[in-house]
Regions:
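The feature marks the first
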Residues: 1-44
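Conserved functional loop/turn residues at catalytic and ligand-binding sites
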Residues: 13-16, 31, 46, 63, ...
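Axial heme c-ligation environment in periplasmic c-type cytochrome domains
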Residues: 20-26, 41-83, 118-123, 141-173
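Extracellular/lumenal glycan-associated surfaces
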Residues: 29-33, 38, 122, 127-128, ...
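Short coil/turn motifs at helix boundaries and re-entrant loops, enriched in small/polar
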Residues: 29-31, 97-100, 128, 142, ...
């Protein structure tokens, strides 16, 4: 059921949820609970995105659960860090945070390998760096407001740190 309902999403997110576009998230292998929450928030307007709001408008709660379950069963393709100059900084932030600025380690919630925790924290490993950068910047700048913790953490990061941690996340396995 989920695959058929997901079909319109393939244009942006890939036939199996592995988006080829760095601007669009990879959804394959993501926790179904997280995906379902995001779909509900696009539909309610709590998470603002004109394209996604239109895509989910006709979906029922059952459709959203089925899509989320199907995407969660797909195999995520690994990503790769691209900037060797910033990946070390990204690793330091991801694994240890920045204590003197009260920035917690990303790994504390999203796990050391980026697997996240079902129903609590999304899987990050292998996600496109461009997408992660856009989301962290959105949280920091108040554009994305559907997670208070992420808004508070991202508010303390500068552009260089966001880019570095995003690139590091892309290469996590």
């Amino acid at each position: 059921k989920g695959e058929a309902s997901y079909a319109p999403g393939a244009a942006c997110h890939g036939a199996d949820g592995n988006s080829g576009s760095p601007a669009n998230p990879k959804l394959a292998g993501q926790h179904p609970e997280y995906l379902n929450k995001q779909l509900q928030e696009f539909k309610s307007g709590k998470r603002a995105n004109a394209i996604m709001s239109g895509m989910v408008a006709a979906l029922s709660p059952e459709d959203m659960k089925n899509i989320s379950a199907w995407l969660g069963q797909q195999k995520a393709k690994p990503g790769f860090a691209k900037d060797k100059q910033t990946v070390a900084l990204g690793e330091r932030i991801y694994r240890g945070g920045i204590a003197d600025r009260q920035i917690p380690a990303c790994a504390g919630c999203h796990s050391p390998n980026g697997a996240g925790l079902p129903s609590q924290y999304p899987r990050l490993s292998g996600q496109h760096a461009d997408y992660t950068t856009a989301q962290l910047s959105g949280f920091r700048d108040g554009v994305r407001q559907n997670n208070l913790t992420m808004t508070q953490v991202a508010a303390k990061l500068n552009d260089r740190e966001i880019k570095a941690v995003s690139d590091y996340i892309a290469g996590l396995r």
